[in-house]
Swiss-Prot record:
One of its GO terms (cellular component) is cytosol. Binds 1 Mn(2+) ion per subunit. It catalyses: oxaloacetate + GTP = phosphoenolpyruvate + GDP + CO2. GTP binds at residues 272-277, 389, 420, 515-518. It comes from the Bacteria. HAMAP family: PEPCK_GTP (MF_00452). The keyword Metal-binding applies. This is Phosphoenolpyruvate carboxykinase [GTP]. Its EC number is 4.1.1.32. GO terms for molecular function: GTP binding; manganese ion binding; phosphoenolpyruvate carboxykinase (GTP) activity. Mn(2+) binds at residues 229, 249, 296. Keywords: Cytoplasm, Decarboxylase, Gluconeogenesis, GTP-binding, Lyase, Manganese, Metal-binding, Nucleotide-binding. Monomer.
Length: 609
């Protein structure tokens, strides 16, 4: 079909010439049966969900257990982000850096243009306008995703400010990020569709200079919901580098003291380190309260007062289900229980509720994430996929801070970096200054937790928890962090801390109880900000003693707390060659400031012997 004969192209609800030309160009290439413009309304959402139920993609859940909620089971080949098929196609290879896959942008465009040719036959091309962050921000970050997946359209309504209001914000000539997505599964006339169409060939490609995202072959999560990691981190980090701000893989937490003073904390953790649990913290210390601003992404820029302010660009939670329960994260469970959730790859109970590993009450029988019968104590495989998800509106979170969508953001008092380390890294360490804090973030690592991820216990470096999400060279990224610190007075900058909830004793048990008790560790950090708490200087930074922490009412062996806080110089000397290996991998763009911090650490460790 020519553009002139594709229904829906000529009655677009916008006069934005650049957008109209792009939609027309994509429609001529991909050959959909029709073009539709998503308006973000409840009516549209309900209609598309009903359509997905009819197609077999969604199962409607028991309205008494999960109101207005649905379960989707993906193709077993399409269950997670695919780092090996994710590309940063900068003009020069050096600008992608050693942590990213790179291909020449012209070559990549050629490959993908061939794949996109006719790829939407038999389907609807959806035009999905959206905004990351509040619509009334001074500089709203707008985007348009073109997709042939209704699953994507309904999920984007939950995860972003999507629809007519975002389109209106673009006006007739406003800038927007072009995000093109196809599942790569055209339908011939009369061909029966499958419940989860996708393609074995997958590309998730970013063009940082032109601020474009091209994704092909996957219908799942971060590969397909292009506002999430693709825009909010990979493209936004390139924007932030050019414009003097930070786009980070961080939760934003509001802590309120007994004196009713609010402190905002941004925290970066690699996967499986409890980011969502901390974002929805329930403090155990009397008088302290916590509220949620965001659980995954923080955009930070300086305010007029010289402080660093953070906004959460997202509109929903896209959380990992397994391990989430009424004990580990009651606030996430309350958010989900309010309804309006799309679950993907969890298990289905006999009464059409959902279940996953770690959830209370193990049923005798389930339909697992592959659609097979699962029988308690007989079936050896997991009922829910380890990366199964819930997609639910942030507005339903009972601990949501009222200012979560303030376009000015919230002023950050502390930045935490944290990993999963059995040894070496203390419960909390305060950086000496901003540059030392950047060094701590640059060397952040987590031990591998399963043999499939690599050798168990091997430390995988994940700088600022951004390893899979950097839109440009990691060395330039470290330098950008250092430069950000030079834009403000040191006294105005957030203090930087390094935390490790996961240290273990010689017998393998956790030394610190974690979860809500982590509020005791955060209290010390706040007292350091207020110059009210002591700490001792060590080769790696300032570390509290057990006496410096508020342990009142905590049933824990004082010797365990001492061990959790210990700085063992021999363990740190063993860490030095691991850091050296990582910095060699970063290569020639490793900033001088980071090298200076590393040299200073080695000197302090030598003096400590």
């Amino acid at each position: 079909m020519t553009a002139a004969t594709i229904p829906g192209l000529d009655n677009a609800p916008t006069k934005h010439q650049g957008l109209l030309e792009w939609v027309r160009e994509v429609a001529e290439l991909t050959q959909p049966d029709r073009v539709a413009w998503a308006d973000g309304s409840q009516e549209e959402y309900d209609r598309l969900c009903a359509q997905l139920v009819e197609a077999g993609t969604f199962k409607k859940l028991n309205p008494e257990k999960q109101p207005n909620s649905y379960l989707a089971l993906s193709d077993p080949s399409d269950v997670a982000r695919v780092e090996s098929r994710t590309f940063i196609c900068s003009k020069r290879e050096i600008d992608a850096g050693p942590t990213n896959n790179w291909m020449d942008p012209a070559e990549m465009r050629g490959i993908l243009t061939d794949l996109y040719r006719g790829c939407m036959r038999g389907r609807t091309l959806w035009v999905v306008p959206f905004c990351m962050g509040p619509l009334d921000a001074d500089d709203p970050k707008l985007g348009v995703e073109i997709t042939d997946s209704e699953y994507v359209v309904v999920s984007m309504r939950t995860m972003t400010r999507m629809g007519a209001a975002a389109l209106q914000k673009m006006g007739d000539d406003g800038f927007f990020v072009k995000a093109l997505h196809s599942i790569g599964a055209p339908l011939e006339p009369g061909q029966k569709d499958v419940p989860w169409p996708c393609n074995d060939t997958k590309y998730i490609t970013h063009f940082p200079e032109t601020r474009e995202i091209w994704s092909y072959g996957s219908g799942y999560g971060g590969n397909a919901l292009l506002g999430k990691k693709c825009y909010s981190l990979r493209i936004a980090s390139a924007m932030a580098h050019d414009e003097g701000w930070l786009a980070e893989h961080m939760l934003i937490l509001k802590l309120i003291s007994p004196e009713n003073k609010a402190y905002y904390i941004a925290a970066a953790f690699p996967s499986a380190c409890g980011k969502t649990n901390l974002a929805m913290l329930q403090p155990t210390i009397p008088g302290w309260r916590a509220e949620t601003v965001g659980d995954d992404i923080a955009w930070m820029r300086f305010g007029k007062d010289g402080r660093l302010y953070a906004t959460n660009p997202e509109f929903g939670f896209f959380g990992v289900a397994p391990g989430t329960n009424w004990d580990s994260n009651p606030n996430a469970m309350k958010t989900i229980a309010a309804g309006n959730t799309v679950f993907t790859n969890v298990a289905l109970t006999d009464d059409h509720d959902v279940w996953w590993e770690g959830l209370e009450g193990e049923p005798d029988h389930l339909i697992d994430w592959k659609g097979q019968d699962w029988i308690l104590r007989e079936t050896e495989t997991k009922a829910a996929h380890p990366n199964s998800r819930y997609c639910t509106p942030i507005s339903q979170c009972p601990t949501l801070a009222p200012e979560w969508d303030d376009p000015q953001g919230v002023p950050i008092s502390a930045i935490l970096f944290g990993g999963r380390r059995k040894t070496t890294v203390p419960l909390i360490t305060e950086a000496r200054d901003w540059q030392h804090g950047v060094f701590i973030g640059a060397t952040l690592g987590s031990e591998q937790t399963a043999a499939a991820e690599g050798k168990v216990g091997t430390v995988r470096r994940d700088p600022m928890a951004m390893l899979p999400f950097l839109g440009y060279n990691v060395g330039d990224y470290f330098q950008h962090w250092i430069n950000i610190g030079k834009q403000a007075d040191e006294s105005q900058l957030p203090k930087v801390f390094f935390v490790n909830w996961f240290r273990r004793g010689d017998d393998g048990r956790f030394l610190w109880p974690g979860f809500g008790e982590n509020s005791r560790v955060l209290k010390w950090a706040i007292e350091r900000i207020e110059h009210k708490a002591d700490g001792k200087s060590t080769p790696i930074g300032i570390v509290p003693t057990a006496a410096d922490l508020d342990l009142e009412g905590l049933d824990v062996d004082p010797a365990d707390v001492d061990e959790a806080l210990a700085v063992n110089a021999d363990e740190w000397r063993a860490e030095v060659p691991l850091i050296e290996e990582w910095f060699e991998f970063v290569g020639e763009k490793l900033p001088t400031g980071i090298k200076d911090e590393f040299d200073a650490l080695k000197t302090r460790l030598a003096e400590d012997s």
